[in-house]
A protein has these predicted regions:
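S-adenosylmethionine/decaboxylated-SAM
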Residues: 1-139
Length: 139
């Protein structure tokens, strides 16, 4: 819990902001124990899909959107991608097989990768690091 936030915060400057959306209060509590004193972090407790629907209605757009869970990656991806500024990044992880994946999930991952590589207005690159990353850059 919090590895993604640690990675992102390490590369951010003092004027940047990280919005962390977490559905489970216990998981957010663990992450907050580590990062709560960092003024760059905004904590949102709630459903990722609901947050995405609310966020696209606001004018703010982001330099980087890191889709680390089902909302924004396997559903409501169009909403998450809409939040990315021109020339910004949309980052997907966990694209290599993982222990505990439900049966048939590899087909979801394969479809996701193929879909991302065919979207107009985006350049994509698969990065064979860690759990398997895809970097998508908006034109």
């Amino acid at each position: 819990v919090g590895y993604g936030a640690a990675w992102l915060l390490d590369g951010m400057d003092a004027d940047s902001r990280l919005v962390s959306v977490e559905l489970e209060a216990d998981l957010q509590r663990i992450a907050r124990a580590t990062f709560d004193d960092d003024p760059r972090v905004e904590w949102v407790l709630g459903d990722g899909s609901e947050w995405l629907r609310e966020a696209v209605a606001r004018p703010e757009r982001f330099d980087v959107v890191f889709a680390d869970t089902w909302p924004g990656k396997y559903h409501d991806r169009d909403l998450a991608m809409e939040l990315v500024k021109p020339h910004g990044w949309f980052v997907l992880d966990d694209l290599y097989p993982q222990p505990g994946w439900p049966d048939g999930h590899q087909a979801n991952v394969d479809r996701l990768i193929a879909d991302m590589q065919s979207i107009d207005g985006w350049r994509t690159e698969f990065l064979p690091w860690g759990s398997g990353l895809m970097l998508c850059v908006r034109d």
